[in-house]
Amino acid sequence: MAAQRPLTIALVAGETSGDILGAGLIRALKARVPNARFVGVAGPRMQAEGCEAWYEMEELAVMGIVEVLGRLRRLLHIRADLTRRFTALKPDVFVGIDAPDFNITLEGNLKKQGIKTIHYVSPSVWAWRQKRVFKIGRSTHMVLAFLPFEKAFYDKFNVPCRFIGHTMADAMPLDPNKNTARDVLGIPHDAHCLALLPGSRGAEVEMLSADFLKTAQLLRQHYPDLEVVVPLVNAKRREQFEKIKAEIAPDLAVHLLDGMGREAMVASDAALLASGTAALECMLAKCPMVVGYRMKPFTFWLAKRLVKTEYVSLPNLLAGRELVKELLQEECEPQKLAEALLPLLANGKTSHVMHDTFRELHQQIRCNADEQAADAVLELAQ
């Protein structure tokens, strides 16, 4: 009698964040089904957990229209080859991790071949290009969503979706220790501390750094002991920021950090940051914040017409109200930013309300996401 085939899960991750999610999912599945086989497109973390890589994740990790066009033939070849090989393999479940432009079409191809498909991490369909929800519904058996309002959106369109909580909320403590973080960064316990996070992309650092630095200068007039920490994601962004600082605020003393964004948030009394994942991380660090964002005028004009949400930052979207001040475009200027930050640095009622609400929101999305994702995969595999 032939031996029964082990549970076979196919996965495709397209960038580092997806590799981290994939590794967590594989770990949770291996704990329950030790002989399971994992195969697909994987980064180093997924491979370390035992995923067989037919292609390296770097092949898919291209950013920007020009770069994608330059690699389009190769990307289309990889997708066609994966469709053929997964169809022959017939895995119990296929999991496309993020990378929606690549994965959702692949999921649709495999679903037509009778393979069960999951899309892990909802694209921002609730915010813009909402019609994508119909393609997602046709292509997948299940979407795994990090945030409760994402599930509510899919429910409106009868697309199967499971809210699993956010892996970042699982990884960060409910009550982080501010003094420990200050010790790591060399910040006195009794000083006022402000974190500036002007973004991870070159365009963001270019558009925001000058206004953020001028804001810090204004705040130091009110708080002469103000410590300013600036975590930058890599050497390129650091060099870019240093050039702008030399021009705008050469005498402003700041702590420049390589990475360490999370430590900077935990250590600070307030943060001024670009929108994006940083705002969610700052909420989970329980650091009161102001969101400042600026883009090229035409891009902003277009975004205003395409984006369907009332708020841009995840804390506000989760709270369903303006919990965090958002100052966009012309509003994102030093005087207004400083006025919004002053009450947060005072560590009074505004800060305490924000802190307590951040903690409640953290609890709402802290659901052991790796285990929940594994549950969804195993239920679909049956």
From Swiss-Prot:
Keyword vocabulary terms for this entry: Glycosyltransferase, Lipid A biosynthesis, Lipid biosynthesis, Lipid metabolism, Transferase
Pfam families noted in UniProt: LpxB
Catalytic activity: 2-N,3-O-bis[(3R)-3-hydroxytetradecanoyl]-alpha-D-glucosaminyl 1-phosphate + UDP-2-N,3-O-bis[(3R)-3-hydroxytetradecanoyl]-alpha-D-glucosamine = lipid A disaccharide (E. coli) + UDP + H(+); a lipid X + a UDP-2-N,3-O-bis[(3R)-3-hydroxyacyl]-alpha-D-glucosamine = a lipid A disaccharide + UDP + H(+)
InterPro entries: Glyco_trans_19
The enzyme's E.C. designation: 2.4.1.182
GO molecular function annotations of the record: lipid-A-disaccharide synthase activity; phospholipid binding
Superkingdom: Bacteria
GO CC annotations on file: membrane
GO biological process entries: lipid A biosynthetic process
Pathway membership: Glycolipid biosynthesis; lipid IV(A) biosynthesis; lipid IV(A) from (3R)-3-hydroxytetradecanoyl-[acyl-carrier-protein] and UDP-N-acetyl-alpha-D-glucosamine: step 5/6
Family stated for the protein in its record: Belongs to the LpxB family.
Main function: Condensation of UDP-2,3-diacylglucosamine and 2,3-diacylglucosamine-1-phosphate to form lipid A disaccharide, a precursor of lipid A, a phosphorylated glycolipid that anchors the lipopolysaccharide to the outer membrane of the cell.
Entry-linked PANTHER family: LIPID-A-DISACCHARIDE SYNTHASE, LIPID-A-DISACCHARIDE SYNTHASE, MITOCHONDRIAL-RELATED
UniProt-listed HAMAP family: LpxB (MF_00392)
Protein name: Lipid-A-disaccharide synthase
Organism name: Salmonella arizonae (strain ATCC BAA-731 / CDC346-86 / RSK2980)
